[in-house]
């Protein structure tokens, strides 16, 4: 079976969804920009030699509809002979795109693929057009489709206090701002055109969503966002609304060597699981355990983790049950996470994987794991091994 390698991984800056840098930039343009950039950065691979493009996106309507993967590829002037498909596993969409491409390569049906994802949550809101079947309440809790309430449930089940949530959220902003100041994101962010507050066109090379002034004291003043009477989860301890895209060049190890391209990491294992929709945020725990089992590893073998921060109330129980609560500052989201950077749904799986690869290189560790929860009760995880 072919070994699957990541040759390159990039992303746009994360733009604020409300009046942010990409308020006048479409999702297809963010995607096409990264497709062009990946090909330009790796000229040994001719675009016509791509076997497929797998692109994650959740809200596939309006500008993100009608197979945005193909629309973006056409905008990027990828040869018409190269196919493209849009993948939807909600929050895990672009990580699923990676898994789909990896399996094609493993079986010999492909040698080189572009994968990634996008979400413009400013142009296409998360709840746009959502219409749950009324009979679904006979099978799952009525609030299972309300992500914030599932996070509240997890926090109560695992003894996660409001103070713990506020502290974790403040850490996310502090870590992300420190990474920005030290240029830790420089290797992954591709400068992308947008508009400043005055409407002037400029190139953005930083994440505008981070709030460096965030403190535990300020977070403590925020009101609960989802359960006003008894809740703990606030806007400050939830993932920010942002716009962005991320992309990876995925190849068979043999083809990469043929072309003289240096792989950055192998895909060691992949896993997707389901869980109770009422605690959808718990999905990373069984997904990570299954991915580790497939890789023949344990959590202690992993040098760094990227765990998507949907909510502080959600990620802390996952960290706790993976036995990592004492290692947060050494291994978990060392450059901050979605609470500070935002969670553009279809983008995030590729985004956290891209950040993980850079952290693995900087920390000089052999193994890394990226994982995320998925709405309505799923989890997805990928173990990477440096080459």
UniProtKB/Swiss-Prot annotation:
Its main location: cytoplasm. GO terms for cellular component: cytoplasm; fatty acid beta-oxidation multienzyme complex. Pfam families: Thiolase_C, Thiolase_N. The active site is at 91 (acyl-thioester intermediate), 343 (proton acceptor), 373 (proton acceptor). One of its GO terms (biological process) is fatty acid beta-oxidation. Induction: Repressed by FadR in the absence of LCFAs (fatty acids of, at least, 12 carbon atoms). When LCFAs are present in the medium, they are converted to long-chain acyl-CoAs which bind to FadR resulting in its release from the DNA and thus derepression of the transcription. Pathway: Lipid metabolism; fatty acid beta-oxidation. It comes from the Bacteria. Keywords: Acyltransferase, Cytoplasm, Fatty acid metabolism, Lipid degradation, Lipid metabolism, Transferase. Its EC number is 2.3.1.16. It is found in: Cytoplasm. One of its GO terms (molecular function) is acetyl-CoA C-acyltransferase activity. Disulfide bonds: none annotated. InterPro entries: FadA (IPR012805), Thiolase (IPR002155), Thiolase-like (IPR016039), Thiolase-like_sf_Thiolase (IPR050215), Thiolase_acyl_enz_int_AS (IPR020615), Thiolase_AS (IPR020610), Thiolase_C (IPR020617), Thiolase_CS (IPR020613). It catalyses: an acyl-CoA + acetyl-CoA = a 3-oxoacyl-CoA + CoA. Heterotetramer of two alpha chains (FadB) and two beta chains (FadA). Belongs to the thiolase-like superfamily. Thiolase family. PANTHER family: 3-KETOACYL-COA THIOLASE FADA, 3-KETOACYL-COA THIOLASE, PEROXISOMAL. Catalyzes the final step of fatty acid oxidation in which acetyl-CoA is released and the CoA ester of a fatty acid two carbons shorter is formed. Involved in the aerobic and anaerobic degradation of long-chain fatty acids. HAMAP family: FadA (MF_01620). This is 3-ketoacyl-CoA thiolase FadA. It comes from Escherichia coli (strain K12).
């Amino acid at each position: 079976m072919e070994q699957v390698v990541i040759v390159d991984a990039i992303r746009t800056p994360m733009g604020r969804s409300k009046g942010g840098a990409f308020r006048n930039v479409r999702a297809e343009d963010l995607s096409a920009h990264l497709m062009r950039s990946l090909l330009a950065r790796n000229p040994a691979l001719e675009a016509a030699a791509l076997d497929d493009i797998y692109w994650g996106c959740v809200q596939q309507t309006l500008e993100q509809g009608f197979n945005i993967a193909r629309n973006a590829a056409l905008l990027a002037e990828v040869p018409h002979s190269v196919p493209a498909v849009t993948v939807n596993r909600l929050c895990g969409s672009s990580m699923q795109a990676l898994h789909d491409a990896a399996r094609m390569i493993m079986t010999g049906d492909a040698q080189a693929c572009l994968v990634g994802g996008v979400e413009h949550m400013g142009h296409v809101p998360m709840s746009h057009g959502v219409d749950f079947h009324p009979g679904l309440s006979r099978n799952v809790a009525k609030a299972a489709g309300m992500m914030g309430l599932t996070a509240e449930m997890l926090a109560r089940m695992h003894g996660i206090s409001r103070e713990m949530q506020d502290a974790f959220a403040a850490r996310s902003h502090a870590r992300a701002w420190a990474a920005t100041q030290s240029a830790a994101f420089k290797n992954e962010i591709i400068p992308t055109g947008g508009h400043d507050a005055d409407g002037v066109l400029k190139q953005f090379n930083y994440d505008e969503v981070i709030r460096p002034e965030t403190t535990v004291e300020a977070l403590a003043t925020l009101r609960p966002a989802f359960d006003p009477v008894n809740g703990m989860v606030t806007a400050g301890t939830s993932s920010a609304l942002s716009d962005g895209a991320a992309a990876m060049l995925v190849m068979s190890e043999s083809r990469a060597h043929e072309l003289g391209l240096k792989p950055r990491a192998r895909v060691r294992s992949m896993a997707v699981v389901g869980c109770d929709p009422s605690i959808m945020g718990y999905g990373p725990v069984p997904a990570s355990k299954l991915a580790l089992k497939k890789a023949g590893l344990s959590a202690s073998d992993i040098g760094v983790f990227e765990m998507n921060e949907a909510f502080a109330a959600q990620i802390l129980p996952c960290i706790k049950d993976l036995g990592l609560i004492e290692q947060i500052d050494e291994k978990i989201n060392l450059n901050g996470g979605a609470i500070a950077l935002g969670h553009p749904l279809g983008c995030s799986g590729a985004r956290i994987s891209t950040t993980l690869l850079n952290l693995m290189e900087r920390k000089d560790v052999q193994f890394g794991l990226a994982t995320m929860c998925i709405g309505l009760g799923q989890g997805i995880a990928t173990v990477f091994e440096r080459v």
